[in-house]
From Swiss-Prot:
It is found in: Cytoplasm. Pathway: Fermentation; pyruvate fermentation; formate from pyruvate: step 1/1. It comes from the Bacteria. NCBIfam families: pyr_form_ly_1. The gene is pfl. Homodimer. It comes from Lactococcus lactis subsp. lactis (strain IL1403). GO terms for molecular function: formate C-acetyltransferase activity. This is Formate acetyltransferase.
Amino acid sequence: MKTEVTENIFEQAWDGFKGTNWRDKASVTRFVQENYKPYDGDESFLAGPTERTLKVKKIIEDTKNHYEEVGFPFDTDRVTSIDKIPAGYIDANDKELELIYGMQNSELFRLNFMPRGGLRVAEKILTEHGLSVDPGLHDVLSQTMTSVNDGIFRAYTSAIRKARHAHTVTGLPDAYSRGRIIGVYARLALYGADYLMKEKAKEWDAITEINEENIRLKEEINMQYQALQEVVNFGALYGLDVSRPAMNVKEAIQWVNIAYMAVCRVINGAATSLGRVPIVLDIFAERDLARGTFTEQEIQEFVDDFVLKLRTMKFARAAAYDELYSGDPTFITTSMAGMGNDGRHRVTKMDYRFLNTLDTIGNAPEPNLTVLWDSKLPYSFKRYSMSMSHKHSSIQYEGVETMAKDGYGEMSCISCCVSPLDPENEEGRHNLQYFGARVNVLKAMLTGLNGGYDDVHKDYKVFDIEPVRDEILDYDTVMENFDKSLDWLTDTYVDAMNIIHYMTDKYNYEAVQMAFLPTKVRANMGFGICGFANTVDSLSAIKYAKVKTLRDENGYIYDYEVEGDFPRYGEDDDRADDIAKLVMKMYHEKLASHKLYKNAEATVSLLTITSNVAYSKQTGNSPVHKGVFLNEDGTVNKSKLEFFSPGANPSNKAKGGWLQNLRSLAKLEFKDANDGISLTTQVSPRALGKTRDEQVDNLVQILDGYFTPGALINGTEFAGQHVNLNVMDLKDVYDKIMRGEDVIVRISGYCVNTKYLTPEQKQELTERVFHEVLSNDDEEVMHTSNI
């Protein structure tokens, strides 16, 4: 039932909350600062699952398993909508079974039809699953709707098209929604939609100067206002009145779920992250515990129900998309812990409750649990986090001090994988990101050496550049050529990104996400790198060893021979690590020299997801690895292929132990890659100590060292930014992975159940370094080739 939103409603909802500076203008940030309670205790207060929770879990798992066998249901006769699709339930015959309502579609795991990103793509997804869109709907959409994909390809330059065809610039969000935007969904819980709509209306009225920028902003605010009304309508489908603020922690969780699921009904971005939700919910929970409104068991049950809902989220994806983002990730990144500007840590009981879901409802890839790590966090929480990583290998860690030095504040959160955002920041830091996937820097370098001819398809000219004709490669000559190749690559990449984000705002503006953000926002534009380690190692080989080019009769380089030893990135050798820093600096400075859409700031990520496998299959030989080559019939031969390492990881051929890897990564300048420097590591429990307690304590010390400036490398300010932590022995999981059993691991930037990986991706995963010692100063590191 709709409630009249009066001052009395706010007095009732906010009773017991401190402070006034968050009441007159929406600011979850200020609300949290005034009201959160740091928790210094341990996990002993946590409750286990209820029978009801386990019943809901079983229904979800059984339904998903069934559809994985027979095929998932798809909408084929209706376009997705926030409020026009009926309410959905876990069990339509027992609606009271649920505690937290709101689902992505009207039926569990029914996949929404989302054509606004690209009608052809949406229809191709159906075709790949043996289905087709309703002919009448196709006719209406094809005649009346311009999709983002349509707009992008109307504007793409010939240089972009060549780069896409060569797979040097590929995988961009030009055929799928961009993602990486995080609404402050707790705003709905704290204020209700009516308050937020009135605030948007005031901001619309305040814009009086009519120019191109303000015309667009007024239209966007209007769309946000309409989206908030649709969120109210969505809540009403379940009998919920989200126009008013939440009265207790159950409603706060419920309101957040309605806001988030409204987003997931209409936006299928490559990452749909949740943001900094636990700390806000904890404030409601602490008030309810003090009042005796709910027990700890009840609050954990609400959290479990919410997380189970998040795990039902699924988008219809094309096969080409799955090659880049395998395992069907949704990147429901949930950020917790961290430090406040006043020196207080931000660990709360709710952080424990979210991590506890790995035990109560079982290990799973989603939500993407992310701990913002600082050495000053309570030891009990750090130890609990490490204990859960030791048990589950499904938590990622981000270094607070590294990100804070670059201006990311106390309510920053992680988007997608490793990318910091500060959604409510009023001091000019990034509120959102214009996502740009990544490009193949190694391929661009190899193509440049061949005079702009593709490194696999030698007859295909990608860009104009003088080739390097030396038989023995000279470092300075190669760097001059590489510098010009990077000019072409970054120019082309920026042009593509500006077009993509202009067209996305024009044809598929994410109004419902933007409605939960400040009206005036500042964006970064995320540019990524793939093939980083092999690029660095190739340049190191050219500089410190002897690299001979192998050419065909036309002078085309098809392979390389290396004589002598050379340092590799990841071995804690400044000779290689300085090259890594130089490559990042060159790349970032070239990007930053461009004018970007809506005056965004260029940021760089060393992150690949599973695209390192896809890019490997599109790249020829380099001085340090075997790539693909063409058979006589023109098909690609992958028989000798060595996969790229993921993200910022060193090559599998690097001789460093885990500590050497950490030191090399800590040297990288975050200012040159402040979209994230992703390290995915696998370490054997045996490398950490003899007993489980010793292993957990050592993990705490290692992460403290990696994330604390100067702690890992004395006399420096170097510190790391991100770690995907897997604590496991390869021999314990190898057979399970290859047989397609459930094995949850962290890969580059997210968590995946390995049964959903392709055979090639499983192969690449099991070929990664699994550290059996912490440092190669003691013993050799075990590679999987030794198994």
